Amino acid sequence: MVAREVIFDMEADNLLDNITKIHCLSYRYVDTPNEVTTLTDYSDIKGFIVDGPCEDAVLIGHNIIGYDLPAIDKILGVTTTCKTIDTLPLSWYLNHGRSVHGLDSYGEDFGVL
């Protein structure tokens, strides 16, 4: 079975050391780009992480290993068994001459911000 790719991002109230609240988690499957789901209820976010698309999916996001997934574990006490692809270290590796690797910087470069 070919794994489905799920792009996700979450927003919270602070950096990891001081986080107290997850505002939302949004995701979409790569093969259905016009269908974005946003979760704000903690039980729904837990369900996505624990029981969600993981059996047949790869979670993809920017800094998910360094921030999103640890933040979810810190606030909700759950971890994922999904395979993950973190685009931040990929950016460091593929664009080693770039001084900034944040999504805002890429958004400016591509004219979407």
Spans of model-derived segments:
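Conserved DEDDh/DEDDy metal-dependent 3′-5′ exonuclease domain
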Residues: V2-F8, L16-D17, I22-L113
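Conserved Rossmann-like nucleotide-cofactor binding loop
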Residues: D13
